[in-house]
Amino acid sequence: AVDNLSFDVKKGEIFGLIGPNGAGKTTVFNCITRFYKPTSGDIYFNNVNGKTVHLNEMKVHNVIKEGIVRTFQNVELVWELNILDNLLVAAHSSYRSNFFHHLVHSRLTKREEVIYTKKAMKILNNLDLTPYTYAFPIGLPYGVLKKVELARTLMSNPKLIILDEPAAGLNDTETKELSEFIKKIKDEYDVTIFLVEHDMGLVMSICDTVCAISFGKKLDIGTPKQIQSSKVVQEAYLGGE
């Protein structure tokens, strides 16, 4: 549960939400992306058109159209499709063609397939994932799969990417590579990153702002350095000195 929690995520920053298990971190994500419906409070978002929208009553698929995408703790790729096709599936919400167009393989469908295939190939190239273009997820290193999942979020032209424990299951080397990967995505694609993560090394090394919560309530918010030195956070989350 979340109790009277309020914060702002600024455009272009990497914002980290930390707290013990059960603190309400994933609940916050689920409320923003409309998997959960908040019983009180308001969630506002400055969308892809620069308009402030109220997310509380919005449907899940419309949240994506507004420019918000997310990943989950576990890799959610389609194992029967190669990496390129996994990216193309993620572009589905951007297609103008409908089921009938796809059924008859209309000119619009063909044109969109060319456009989005080029886009996917460009993303894979920009993020140094080209060697895996036609590979299938099964058998690939877990660190690569995490990167592919992040690359896939870019297919819908997001403004905000929400990452739920992106470093979960990664070793130290993979985590370091992922942190650089996240920063590269933020810089090259001009997106805002909002992440929940238990790996404090990753959080403190890449986040511009960190918000610490416990039992659904905000403990403190500030720069990584400020949070590391916060007595409230040390006592509630880090166990004090």
Residue map of PLM features:
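Glycine-rich phosphate-binding loops of nucleotide-dependent enzymes
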Residues: 1-241
